[in-house]
Amino acid sequence: MEHRCGKKLFEKTEIVSHEYAGADCYCLTVRLPRMMEVPELPRAGQFYMISLHDKSHILPRPISLHSFDEKQGTLSFVYRPIGAGTQELTQYRAGESLAIQGPLGNGFMIPSAGSCHIIAGGGIGLAPLPQLIRAIRCKQPEARIIFFAGGRDRHIQELIDFFALPADIELVLCTDDGSLGINGFVPDVLSAYIEKCRNSGNLCADIAMIYACGPTAMLNKIRAFSQSAQLPCQLSLERRMACGVRACMGCSIQTAAGVKKVCADGPVFDSLLFPHELP
C-alpha cells in the first residue's frame, strides 16, 4: 500500500518545535509541505525513519508517530533518548531541516464492531497511543475507552499531562514503585480490572479490542491474558531496524504464519500470531 506521505523516499521537512515532554521524553514536530497533496493519512501505530545530520550514524532511527495535524501539515514524534542517535536528535532546533521517510508499516486496525476499547501502554510505548485514542473517537464517538498507562514512577504524570488526553476516556495509571496511581505493572492491573468488572457486570461485555504497546515483557503478559480470556488483541512490537522497508532481515520474527518482518508486516500484529512468548 502506498501511504500518504510517501513510502520509498526520504522527504525534507522543517522542524517546527522541539520540546521536553516529561518523563525523560521529548516531542519533535516537523512540517511536511506536501502532506495536504496526497491521498492517505498516516495511521496510529505506524512509524517513520528519521535521518540524522551526523552521517557517522549511517542508519536512520525508527520512531513511531505520536500525532499529526492535517490542516497544519505537521507530524509529531515523542521519543526517549537512549543511544547516541537519539541523544543527537535532542540537539536539533526549530527552523532546522530534517529528512524523514514514512509512514511505514502497518498500524492499529480499529474494528467496527464492539463498543469498548481497551488500550495499554508502558513507558515510551505510550507515545503512539494518543493518536489511537483520537482515531477511535473519530470512528466511534460514543465508544468507551479505557486507557491503562504505566511508568517507572510518578514522573509518568508529566507525559500524561503533555498528551492532553480527552476528558471522557477512563484513565488508569500505575507505577512500578507505587508513587502514582496503582502500585503494579500494566498487564497485572489490566487483567485484574477486566476480571473484576466482568464478575460484577460493570464492564461492557462488548469489548472491541485490546491494543498494547510497550516493553516485550508487558506485551507477552497481555498476549497471554487476551488469549486465555478469548479477547481480541493487537500488539505493537519494537525491534531494531536497519531499513524500515522490508529490504533487510534485521527485524524478522517467527510467527504462527511464518517469518514476518516487523517493519513491513508490523509493527502492529494480531496477538494470535504469537501462540508462544515473543522473543
Question: Residue locations for each model-derived region?
Answer:
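FNR/FR-type flavoprotein reductase catalytic core
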Residues: 84-235
